[in-house]
Amino acid sequence: MHIKEICLEGFKSYATRTVVPGFDPHFNAITGLNGSGKSNILDSICFVLGITNLQQVRAANLQELVYKQGQAGITRATVSVTFDNSERNRSPLGHEDHSEITVTRQIVVGGKNKYLINGKLAQPNQVQNLFHSVQLNVNNPHFLIMQGRITKVLNMKPMEILSMLEEAAGTRMYENKKEAALKTLEKKQTKVDEINKLLEKDILPALEKLRREKSQYMQWANGNAELDRLKRFCVAFEYVQAEKIRDNSIHVVEEMKIKMTGIDEQTDKTQGEISELEKQIKALTQAREASMGGEVKALSDKVDSLSNEVTRELSKLTNMEDTLQGEEKNAEKMVHNIEDLKKSVEERASALNKCDEGAAELKQKFQEFSTTLEECEREHQGILAGKSSGDEEKCLEDQLRDAKISVGTAETELKQLNTKISHCEKELKEKKSQLMSKQDEAVAVENELDARKNDVESVKRAFDSLPYKEGQMEALEKDRESELEIGHRLKDKVHELSAQLANVQFTYRDPVKNFDRSKVKGVVAKLIKVNDRSSMTALEVTAGGKLFNVIVDTEDTGKQLLQKGDLRRRVTIIPLNKIQSHLVPPRVQQATVGKGNAELALSLVGYSEELKNAMEYVFGSTFVCKTTDAAKEVAFNREIRTPSVTLEGDVFQPSGLLTGGSRKGGGDLLRQLHDLAEAETKFRAHQKSLSEIEANIKELQPLQTKFTDMKAQLELKMYDMSLFLKRAEQNEHHKLGDAVKKLEEEVEEMRSQIKEKEGLYKSCADTVSTLEKSIKDHDKNREGRLKDLEKNIKTLKARIQASSKDLKGHENVRERLVMEQEAVTQEQSYLKSQLTSLRTQISTLASDVGNQRAKVDAIQKDHDQSLSELKLIHAKMKECDTQISGSIAEQEKCLQKISDMKLDRKKLENEVTRMEMEHKNCSVKVDKLVEKHTWITSEKRLFGNGGTDYDFESRDPHKAREELERLQTDQSSLEKRVNKKVTAMFEKAEDEYNALMTKKNIIETDKSKIKKVIEELDEKKKETLKVTWVKVNQDFGSIFSTLLPGTMSKLEPPEGGTFLDGLEVRVAFGDVWKQSLSELSGGQRSLLALSLILALLLFKPAPIYILDEVDAALDLSHTQNIGRMIKSHFPHSQFIVVSLKEGMFSNADVLFRTKFVDGVSTVQRTVTKQS
């Protein structure tokens, strides 16, 4: 493959489209003046080949490859190179079917860089692969020989020359890949070390721990299975017992009902006997009354009559004596009142004298005139109206009529009351006599009633003394159900939150026996309490990873935990006695907190005082700020310069570092911990409440049983007493007692009414007497008094009118004193007349009382004689009552028997009710057990059968219940420690372990393979380098001899080494080998270096070679030798040579001459080869 044509447009100095056609397949030369665009043609070829090192084409960037860098209106550079691809055996891979290949590269100023292969867009790597397949790697261009490269070769060290040989042989790429492979081996070894470290420190300990936890889990799971079997056994026994009670209670209830029926029949029979006895008693009583009733009745009537008469007369005597005593007391009272009034008159007379003495004569006269005038006018008006005085509303005749009517009414009512009371007293006496005859019977009934009341009171006291209230157990059971429901909900919530916070849980095994767990305080996050939820995000950012640190009391405790605590994960431990905190100074705190927008993070969390050092270490050096401005002020203020965090979680460091942005779930950890703490607190409170309720229930169960029994006993006693009371109320003595009590109350009430009416009657009679006297006196003096009064009034008015003005000041006092004195005087006179009348009446009453007392004594004597005769007859009747009493006693026995039978029946009723309730409860219990445990239906047939899980004989149910409770306690305790996810975790850890071991084995295998291949390739490299050395050495000598006849050159190892230690260039002139290259001239040295480069190129010839002024330092003869050498040694490669010397391009087959015309390069082709 060789170049046929190059087309340039806008590339460097080629502004317009310029085609450079007809390249010779062998030797082409390009010549022209400096700056005419010779090297730009070579640069265009490198440009198309995809060069990335732009210094090779003398440009700093792709824009400099455009004509005048796009400033002349040309904004793109395009180069197309057409290759002859007629030799199929040397064609690029994938392009064997194309006879020509055109590769185009175009760049646009500020735009894209694109490649085209045969007019189709291609990627840069496609173009590179195309040229790499024919040994044209433009980024390592051994086919491009520049003048500077020759100079470098002369100064190379042995190893550098060996490196060139390796590149020619193709082993250099192997060395690069070998170095990369060795680095890969190092990385793999590092990976293996990491895997081993991970296995040793994390995976294997975790796997071993999970294996132990899995063993615990299997123990817990097996325990659950045993627990389930025990639960089923206990539930089955409970079911069988409830079913047995339910079925048996029906028969027991039926038997009790039969007994109750028998009791009812016996009661009816006894009731019939009682009826017969009543008839018998009635017959005996009638017979007794027939024989002795007449005489007894006559005497009884006489006694009753005399008794009533004694009572009546005695009542009169008592009333008369009371009246006498009352009148005597009234007389004494009147005497006392008269003395008081006398003193009052004297006092008022003295006061009036003093008033008169202290006033002027005119005042005295005016007072007298005024008083006299008023009295005269009042008296005059009263006389005209028919009154005794002027102060009364009715006239004397009306008052007298009303008083007489009141006297008549009072007298009538007194007579009626006396008649009623006589009748009641007679009846009361009869009833009392009958009541006395039944006294023995009443005492017996009373004693029996007291005994029954005492029984009831005794039972009631015992019942009331029980510390149990009705409904208390039901209320507790209801509370227990409520607490259980709430507890289950809270427990689920705690488990859910605990699962979410598994990474905060700190679990460890006691490092030593009897280890004090109080030394381990816990994880920081669980030891703080945040009251303000809005600051949780800021606090979480402030603490960061320290939230998961574990606080212990001393460093020794931490050391024990790390070494022997069997920790599940890596933890950082904070010993309280060693931790050092950097608390913000108080001065800075005060300066900041005073602003109101910033608070020390430590002040926002609650904690135990013993954790103060650790909390200061975690939260003591950062401020939490409400706003971003406040956070900036705290962080960057010279006086404060303290890290700060906003409520949103943005961090400001005094160094200027800011951290912020979106925080997914900021503060969730502390919020979840807060919720977990609240849930655990509530759960513990409800568990405590539930425990208290359970304890109360357990404590109340015996009391409830005793309460139920006592209640039934009390009901029976009260029912028994109520029956006795009903029977006692039907007793004749009870009826008589009620009648006597009622009569006594009526008599007492009527006596009270008589006393009131007698007082009223006396008062009305006195009023009548007084009024009659007043009317009589009034009629005699009326006319004379009227005339005198009118005359006096006329005179007094005239005098008063004349002196009224002067007397006005003393009138009120004088008038009052005169009126009071007159009133007292009148009252005194009235009382004296009343006292005289009263003493006369007292004398009369005393005589009447003596007569009445003699009458009462005579009647009482007759009554006592008749009563003695009646008692003798009653004694005789008592003998007849013995038989009646016997019948009554028999009747009482029958009644007692009925009462006992009713009591027995009540007991049976209560027992039936209890059994029915027990039957109902057991039925409900059976249904609930079946509903709650669905397996009962399918396994019921096995209950109680030998050889099954429900063999109640071989296994004691009570011990099974105790074992169940113990196992539940053990399982509950184990459940708190067991890791329920351990199976999945163990499988995952085991998979990770197996995966790591697989990776490790693969890496170990790859290492072995790589090492083996490297060893094999090292041997092949030696062989290939040796072959290459021999071939290059031969061509090196041949080419140098051609360029400089009479000389020889070779490559040989340093003294005492092999060719793998490097190669040195040796030169001989004739047969003499030079010791150093410094003996050569500059031209000779250039030819030597060029010979070496061409010898290396000849080892694996490329299809194209480019030489850029490699003959610059040579004279003409040496230049001609280069041309001859190229023709002789590279017959299958195309050479494109840039040279200014004719000796070089004279040997070329085609010569291209460049010129610079009007700022644009042009090319002219000349064929020098003869056909």
Curated annotation (Swiss-Prot):
Chain coiled-coil ranges: 172-510, 674-1026
Keyword vocabulary terms for this entry: ATP-binding, Cell cycle, Cell division, Coiled coil, DNA condensation, Meiosis, Mitosis, Nucleotide-binding, Nucleus
Pfam families the record matches: SMC_hinge, SMC_N
Any GO MF annotation of the entry: ATP hydrolysis activity
CDD domains assigned to the protein according to its UniProt record, in alphabetical order: ABC_SMC2_euk
GO BP field: cell division; chromosome condensation; meiotic cell cycle
Sequence ranges assigned to domain Zinc-hook in this UniProt record: 2-1158
Binding site residues for ATP: 32-39
Tissue expression notes: Highly expressed in roots and young floral buds.
Name of the protein: Structural maintenance of chromosomes protein 2-2
UniProt similarity note: Belongs to the SMC family. SMC2 subfamily.
A GO-annotated cellular component: chromosome
Subunit details: Forms a heterodimer with SMC4. Component of the condensin complex, which contains the SMC2 and SMC4 heterodimer, and three non SMC subunits that probably regulate the complex: CAPH, CAPD2 and CAPG.
Entry domain remark: The SMC hinge domain, which separates the large intramolecular coiled coil regions, allows the heterodimerization with SMC4, forming a V-shaped heterodimer.
Protein's job: Central component of the condensin complex, a complex required for conversion of interphase chromatin into mitotic-like condense chromosomes. The condensin complex probably introduces positive supercoils into relaxed DNA in the presence of type I topoisomerases and converts nicked DNA into positive knotted forms in the presence of type II topoisomerases. Also involved in chromosome segregation in meiosis.
